[in-house]
A protein has these predicted regions:
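C-terminal motif of bacterial Sec signal peptides marking the signal peptidase cleavage site
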Residues: 17-20
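Extended active-site neighborhood of metal-dependent phosphoesterases/phosphodiesterases
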Residues: 34-51, 107-198, 218-234, 239, ...
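Active-site glycine-centered loops adjacent to acidic/histidine catalytic or metal-binding residues
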Residues: 69, 99-100, 133-134, 204, ...
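Short acidic, glycine-rich surface-loop motifs adjacent to enzyme active sites
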Residues: 192-212
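N-terminal active-site segment of His-dependent metallophosphoesterases
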Residues: 22-109
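Bacterial N-terminal signal peptides that target proteins for export
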Residues: 1-10
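Hydrophobic beta-strand anchors of alpha/beta hydrolase catalytic cores
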Residues: 64, 95, 167, 199-200
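Histidine-centered catalytic micro-motifs
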Residues: 200-207, 238-248
């Protein structure tokens, strides 16, 4: 009897992996598609080498907006609202999306258009930086993300009256940074961190959870988490901003503030986002909901 159940379960899994569907990537849920993280990292560094590092001019005290997990299919209503508020706020400087930008095959261009500047709706052309999430890899989505959005690992600067701050986007979409990205991060922080007032890390998968709640695209291995915690403490990282789990959490550990931002997905009762004001004193948070 047990053998029959196991056989039927295996056949069902095989059918799910082989079936074609534009809404659910069963194969990707169990085994995320697209290139592995080391390959994405190498491609991202190559792309970074062909373009200048983005630099935003701001006051010593500046504000930016953060949202995550819009899971765009054909409905962009909450994302549109977020972008409209951001680009009409005279106190803002830029925005960040922490991954899981899409939830359906071929929707990366829909997401790109939704976060694009619209002269008839927006007063300011603030940039919005995008982080890659596990859902962005489904349906062989890395090619779309790379071609439509850009690299999954990159950094940008905010230049202000007292120098510069650095923001580093890490690719954790497979539930790991991978050996090559970890090695690069150690070397990059050792060589570059001292040039900046504040260092802020943005990534999709939160590094403090180890329950592997979302299978192969779940949470980061314990050994990697410990290495990142030590690295961020050592190099005085101010914030580590994360998404993925669709709930809010705010923890400070060893002087580093680790924040999970809740989802902005339109189906939820209270789609939320976060406004952060950065100054020489640190960071102040203002939680908001999409109206």
């Amino acid at each position: 009897m047990l053998q029959m159940v196991n056989k039927n379960a295996a056949l069902l899994l095989l059918l799910l992996l082989l079936c074609g569907c534009d809404k659910v990537d069963f194969k990707g849920f169990v085994m995320p598609t697209g290139d592995v993280v080391n390959s994405r990292f190498e491609q991202s560094l190559e792309m970074n080498g062909s373009m200048p590092v983005a630099c935003i001019e701001a006051d010593e005290s500046y504000m930016f907006y953060v949202a995550t997990d819009p899971h765009i299919n054909d409905n962009t209503s909450t994302l549109d609202s977020f972008v409209n508020v951001l680009r009409n706020d005279e106190n803002a400087s830029f925005g960040i999306m922490l991954g899981d930008c899409i939830d359906k095959r071929g929707c990366m261009s829909v997401y790109r258009d939704a976060i694009g500047y619209k002269a008839d709706k927006h007063r300011y052309q603030y940039p919005i930086f995008s982080v890659i999430g596990n859902h962005d890899l489904y349906f062989q989505g890395w090619d779309d993300f790379r071609d439509v959005i850009g690299p999954s690992v990159y950094w940008f600067e905010v230049k202000h009256g007292e120098g510069k701050d650095i923001f580093i986007s890490l690719d954790s979409a497979n539930g790991t940074l991978g050996s090559k990205q970890m090695k690069w991060l150690r070397e990059f922080l050792a060589e570059e961190r001292g040039k900046y007032r504040h260092c802020i890390v943005v990534t999709h998968t939160n590094i403090l959870y180890t329950d592997n709640s979302q299978f192969s695209s779940g949470n980061i291995p314990m050994e990697e988490t410990m290495a990142l915690l030590d690295l961020f403490r050592k190099h005085n990282v101010l914030l580590c901003l994360q998404g993925h789990d669709h709930f809010r959490e705010d923890i400070t550990f060893d002087g580093v503030r680790y924040t999970i931002v809740g989802t902005i997905r339109y189906e939820v009762e209270k789609p939320e986002y976060l406004c952060i004001r950065v100054s020489k004193k640190g960071a102040e948070y203002y939680w908001r909901y999409v109206e």
